[in-house]
């Protein structure tokens, strides 16, 4: 499967979990985001070698779930649907941010 196809598959899963189209892959600063949303980017590529050739590549993504209501169940929903590791939570500009890491 091509890398773009795989990322678009991830994007579709994120949209399904959110229940809207507010997913942003590495958006430029000029993009106006609508909430709740998920902003995500590739953070690392883990390569396994066999006989000095790349055998397996796993891409790690950082996902930031951004939402307004502190009682929103979106973080739980995301953790129920995907294999993610929760890294931290913070509030900025009166918006809640949950940062997750996942391989996809």
Predicted regions and their residues:
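Oligomerization/assembly interface segments of phage tail-like spikes and tubes
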Residues: 57-69, 96-104
């Amino acid at each position: 499967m091509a890398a773009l196809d795989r990322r678009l598959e991830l994007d579709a899963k994120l949209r399904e979990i959110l229940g809207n189209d507010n997913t942003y892959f590495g958006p430029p600063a000029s993009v106006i985001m609508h909430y709740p949303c998920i902003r995500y980017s590739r953070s690392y590529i883990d390569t396994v070698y066999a006989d000095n050739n790349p055998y397996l590549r796993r891409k790690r993504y950082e996902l930031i779930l951004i939402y307004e209501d502190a009682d929103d169940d979106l973080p739980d929903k995301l953790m129920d649907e995907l294999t993610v590791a929760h890294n931290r939570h913070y509030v900025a500009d009166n918006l809640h941010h949950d940062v997750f890491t996942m391989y996809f």
